Amino acid sequence: MKNMTEGEPLKLIIPFMIPLLIGNVFQQLYNIADIIIVGRTIGVNALAAVGATAPLFMMLVILTLGMSGGFSVVTGQLFGAGDLDGVRRSAAMSTMLCTMFVIIMMAAAVMFIDPVLALMNIPPELYADAKSYVMIIVYGLIFMMAYNMLSNILRSLGDSKTPLYFLIVATLLNIVLALVFIINFGWGVPGSALALVVAQGFSGLLCIIYIAKKFPVLHVRLSDFKWDSRFAWEHIRMGLPMAVQFSVLGLGMIIIQAICNQFGSETIAAFTSAMRIEQLALQPMISFGLAMAVYTAQNFGARKFGRISRGVKKCSQLSLAFSLFAAVIMYFFGQEMIGIFLDNPSPKVMAEAKQYLHLSVPFYFFLSQIFIYRNSVQGMGISMIPMLSGVVELLLRSAAASYLTIDYGYTGECYASPIAWVGSSIFLFASYHYFLRLLARKNLGFKLK
């Protein structure tokens, strides 16, 4: 367990962030490995089938991350306040709520998968593989939620290293299983999805074993599972807006993908490859944001608001530096990375992947600030602002993708996300400073600098 309420903010945040960064990189490798194996062993259509439904898969991932991450904010605040009994009860409540949430998600997915895929304009030649991939992921949602919930709880108590170790193991297992299922067993795209589910289940099991042996504070009792509507609401108040916020972002990506799917398999493959490479480059900024959520949650629980202000300012500056570095790497070397996804990719795939990267990198500055301010406000318990920022992103991304593609085609599609980043970052920056000044006016023991 790590207390982040004492000491120099960056000296606490950076060591905490590094395991998160490595973990997030492996999380991306976890997903990229499937894309590479599918693309290089089966072909461009298989890669396009997985890529065409990638936003749907990411929607499921971020819903579980958002809900469990919101619940863990409550756990982190209780830990920061020194309420260890509350920490245990929070873990039990998170388990109950996450289980209910997974059941609802699975039922909704089974009922609406065909209409959703139809709305996404999945090409007929990709439909069977695309549907089988998504449904296998859906049936394994309980494993995805288990790992995300338990790893978020561990991080809320200051342990960011252990979830990393388990994720590394799961990533390696996923690669091995994907190769076996696809090459040896000939299961194709469904084999890739099954490998992912099995690896996620194994990482969740490792978390359970570790908590049982090393974290007595999380050894929940039967009495901890007693339903308390007020306590449940405290978790839902944080988890639901965060899940809605993430799902709104995911919906925006689904809309963009649906428009992209109209351009054919090669454009889908190009867009998928470029997005995967970009996500890898953005991980330092994402990791700083995740670290700030824990940092602000603990300091908010300890009523140390001045530390929140200092930490956010310093982390924002550092994240900006990383965004400039990532932009340079993606602009000059992004195209070379695209070749890992396909064996002998066509000139069109390479050109369109390069085009997306070159048009998006100038806007990484805005994206870096989104991660810092959104997670910081979330850690302070102001759950509606991150959700509203997601709505801003959805509206801007959808409008840009819909209207710009009419006149500019694929080029207009490439500008949709950057436009959304600009609008959302401005909204979050203004909201964070408004609420910080509100705390200062209430004479809560700190001054803005």
Where are these regions (language model features)?
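Small-residue-rich hydrophobic transmembrane alpha-helices
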Residues: 47-107, 144-163, 270-334, 367-389
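Generic alpha-helical transmembrane segments of integral inner-membrane proteins
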Residues: 21, 25, 29, 33, ...
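Transmembrane helical elements of multi-pass membrane transporters/channels
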Residues: 15-34, 136, 147, 170, ...
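Short alpha-helical transmembrane segments in multi-pass integral membrane proteins
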Residues: 1-17, 75-140, 184-240, 296-362, ...
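Small-residue hotspots at the loop-to-helix junctions and early N-terminal turns
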Residues: 44-55, 130, 134, 193, ...
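Short runs within selected transmembrane alpha-helices of multi-pass transporters and secretion channels
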Residues: 68, 137-155, 163-171, 192-207, ...
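Residue-level signal for short hydrophobic patches within transmembrane helices
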Residues: 6, 10-29, 33, 56-63, ...
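Helix-terminus/linker motif at the lipid-water interface of multi-pass membrane proteins
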Residues: 25, 29-48, 117-124, 180-187, ...
